[in-house]
Amino acid sequence: LDMLIKEKESHIGIDIKEGSMSAYHSTRKRLQEFIQRKYHVSDLAFSQLTENFIYELQAFCLGELGHQQSTFFRVAADLKTVCRLAYREGLADTLLFDKVHIERGDKKAPKALDKEALDKLKALCFDELEKEMGTARDVFLFACYTGAAYCDLMELSKKHLVRDDAGSLWLKFNRQKTGVLCRIKLLPGAVRLIEKMHSDERETLLPHIKYPTYQSCLKALRLRAGISFPFTSHTA
């Protein structure tokens, strides 16, 4: 990636604007953070990459960093460009990720579910073998009530709950993605979900569910509830 950035920088003022370089530096930062967290090293050789790498990177960007699909699409495009450059220069034996399709995503604000769709989700019932489905549904509903991102929801604990002078319950936390302090007054539905999902065996407010599992469950929930709009974690 450093080779690609250096090549692009040599074109500044010719066919590339200086401002556009920030996207490449952002991609480099996200890749490095992912590699350090996942593999506990500062860099990987092309021979160490598998086709699954890009999907794990996607789960990291969307789940842990809280980015939208349109943001990851740019990261994936840069990664593919780097792999083509490496193959061309003889640094990689295979053309990695060439046939992997990544959805572009929508840069516009995600469309929200209407009350009818939310009521359909609330009405769903699950048996003992569908615990993850029930958890995904409740976490998603809590996200709808609060507007909080998945990565923030999974880190919320009892210390983030505060009461004002009127006795109303609030969430107070810093967003992982931006560091901005958020204060969210909890609606009655959100309070009921906290009580429902409460457990003395953990410190977090909500049960942990892995991001890929969460997304898969949301797809299944949509079909089961008969909701036509293809919602994701970002829709909340």
Language-model segments: what does each one mean?
Residues 1-28, 89:
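Short, aromatic/basic-rich helix-turn unit that serves as a nucleic-acid recognition element
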Residues 19, 27-37, 63-98, 149-151, ...:
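N-terminal DNA-binding recognition helix of tyrosine site-specific recombinases/integrases
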Residues 19-22, 35-60, 207, 233:
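A Lys/Arg-rich helix-loop hairpin that forms a DNA/phosphate-binding surface
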Residues 20, 24-27, 50, 71, ...:
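Hydrophobic (often cysteine-bearing) scaffold residues that line and stabilize catalytic clefts
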Residues 41, 126-130, 196-208, 215-236:
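Short, basic (Lys/Arg/His-rich) helix/loop patches that form interaction surfaces
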Residues 69, 73-77, 92-150, 168:
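Basic, Lys/Arg- and aromatic-enriched nucleic-acid-binding interface segment
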Residues 101, 146, 155-195:
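Conserved tyrosine-mediated DNA breakage-rejoining catalytic core shared by Y-recombinases
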Residues 119, 144-147, 151-155, 184, ...:
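Feature representing long, continuous alpha-helical segments
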